[in-house]
Every structure is written in C-alpha cells, then in structure tokens.
C-alpha cells in the first residue's frame, strides 16, 4: 500500500455541513498493526489548520494492562502518540498532549523505589519527554472551554463537541463522518475480552452473610 493509502487510513474525515454551520473535523483513526513495523511505516499526522476540530477515534475505555507498546514519535510535528495492543493487533493514535501530561506525572511520582540507576533513568526520560512536549506548544490550544463543556476528544478550536455515542452536544448529532468502507474506524469498537483489573480494598467490618452461612453449617441436635 502506498503512502497516500496509509494517510487515508489514519487521517482526514470530512463531515457534512448542517444548517450553514462549519462542521469540518480532522479525524485521526486507529488501524490494524500486527507488528511494530506496521506502526513505523505510517507517516506522521500533519498539523491541520486552526479552524478544524481534532478527533481521536479510540475506544471509550482502554485496558492499559493489555498495551504492549507506547510510541512517542519524536520526529512528528504533533508528537504522534500510539498505543499498541499486540493481541488485538490494533494501534490507537491518542491525544499526545493529554497522554504525555499523565505520563510525565507518573514519572515524577515520588513513591518510586529510590534506586540510583532507576532514578537517573527516570529523570532523563522525564527531561526528554518534557522538552519534546514544550517544543510543540504551537500544536496545542490553551484556550479554556466554556463552563459546563467537557471535550472527550482534543480540539484545537476548543469546540464543545463530545462523542456522538454519548448523546448530541450543541447540535452535532446530525453530522455523519464519511468513512471508507474498508476502514475499521467505521465499525463499533468491540469490548475487550479481558476485563480491567479489580482493586481489592480491605473491609474491617465482618460480612453478615458469611457469619450466617457458618451458623447454618452447624449440625442440628436430634431429640430422642
């Protein structure tokens, strides 16, 4: 497949115009990736104009325990960030600014083991990623959204768009993306086969149902 084909699988989806209002979005799609080379072959996502909304078509919930690789493409103008699930053979392009911000917070978490080699490596990684993020300030928008607006996808225009599967927001329910028939982004994301891990919490209060069951197991005395 040529370079134009790869770009077509990842990048731009043009949405129809309703009611005279501009509704063009820059859709960044996930794709099939059976091996690392499938991700590295994909060209960088070019930065669109400032009047376009960015939307990352990722699953509504990602189980990070199933992620086999994280790619920060340093040479890309928008610091393309990709999560790879080798088992599902999927690569998800995610919001680099939100993901890297959380990643840097994890790297600076003080509760990590005070191992000298690990600490030096972690600090060096933090410095490199911090510099990569700071050098791309022109790609991010720092204009706050209006009160009561929650954007589920990154948008340089900071429009209150949200996800269509969570209900209409500001009249965007009529916008239908024009997707190629062979593009997997047009399909509904399948639920993960492995549920997310459940964190057990200690409960000092004894459970009444367990005590009731133990009492029921006691043998009853028979009267002669």
From Swiss-Prot:
What residue spans carry the Basic residues bias annotation?
213-224
Identify its membrane topology class: Peripheral membrane protein
User: What happens when you mutate residue 90 to R?
Assistant: In strain: Nonneuroinvasive mutant HF10
For this record, the Gene Ontology CC terms, alphabetical, are:
host cell Golgi apparatus; host cell plasma membrane; membrane; viral envelope; virion membrane
Compartment(s) where it occurs, according to its Swiss-Prot or TrEMBL record: Virion membrane; Host cell membrane; Host Golgi apparatus, Host trans-Golgi network
**Subunit structure, per the record?**
Interacts with glycoprotein H (gH); this interaction is necessary for the correct processing and cell surface expression of gH. The heterodimer gH/gL seems to interact with gB trimers during fusion.
Mention any Pfam family matching this sequence. Answer: Herpes_UL1
Segments of this protein annotated with the region Disordered: 161-224
UniProt keyword annotations, A-Z: Disulfide bond, Fusion of virus membrane with host cell membrane, Fusion of virus membrane with host membrane, Glycoprotein, Host cell membrane, Host Golgi apparatus, Host membrane, Membrane, Signal, Viral envelope protein, Viral penetration into host cytoplasm, Virion, Virus entry into host cell
Is Membrane among the key words of this record?
A: yes
Q: Which InterPro entries match?
A: Herpes_gL_C (IPR022200), Herpes_gL_N (IPR007923), Herpes_gL_N_sf (IPR038311), HSV_GL_alphagamma (IPR034708)
Any GO BP annotation: symbiont entry into host cell
For this chain, the annotated S-S bridges are 44-76, 149-160
Which first-to-last residue range defines the signal peptide?
1-19
Can the keyword Ribonucleoprotein be found in this entry's annotation?
Answer: no
Return the annotated region ranges for Interaction with gH.
Answer: 20-161
Residue intervals of the gL alphaherpesvirus-type domain: 23-201
**Protein name stated in the entry:** Envelope glycoprotein L
Free-text function comment from the UniProt entry: The heterodimer glycoprotein H-glycoprotein L is required for the fusion of viral and plasma membranes leading to virus entry into the host cell. Acts as a functional inhibitor of gH and maintains gH in an inhibited form. Upon binding to host integrins, gL dissociates from gH leading to activation of the viral fusion glycoproteins gB and gH.
Q: Which family does it belong to?
A: Belongs to the herpesviridae glycoprotein L (gL) family. Alphaherpesvirinae gL subfamily.
Provide the primary localization. virion
């Amino acid at each position: 497949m040529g370079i134009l084909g790869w770009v077509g699988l990842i990048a731009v989806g043009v949405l129809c115009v309703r009611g005279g209002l501009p509704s063009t979005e820059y859709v960044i799609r996930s794709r099939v990736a059976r091996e690392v080379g499938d991700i590295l072959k994909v060209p960088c996502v070019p930065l669109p104009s400032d009047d376009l909304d960015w939307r990352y078509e990722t699953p509504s919930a990602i189980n990070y325990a199933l992620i086999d690789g994280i790619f920060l493409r340093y040479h890309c103008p928008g610091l393309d960030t990709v999560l790879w699930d080798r088992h599902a053979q999927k690569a998800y392009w995610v919001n680099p600014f939100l993901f890297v911000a959380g990643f840097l917070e994890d790297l600076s978490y003080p509760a990590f083991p005070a191992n000298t080699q690990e600490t030096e490596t972690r600090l060096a990684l933090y410095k490199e990623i911090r510099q990569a993020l700071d050098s791309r300030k022109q790609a991010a928008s720092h204009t706050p959204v209006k009160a009561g607006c929650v954007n589920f996808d990154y948008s340089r225009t900071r429009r209150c768009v949200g996800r269509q599967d969570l209900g209409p927001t500001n009249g965007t329910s009529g916008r239908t993306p024009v997707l190629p028939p062979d593009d997997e982004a047009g399909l509904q994301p399948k639920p993960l086969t492995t549920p997310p891990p459940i964190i057990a919490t200690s409960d000092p209060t004894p459970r009444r149902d367990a005590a009731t069951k133990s009492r029921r197991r006691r043998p009853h005395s028979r009267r002669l």
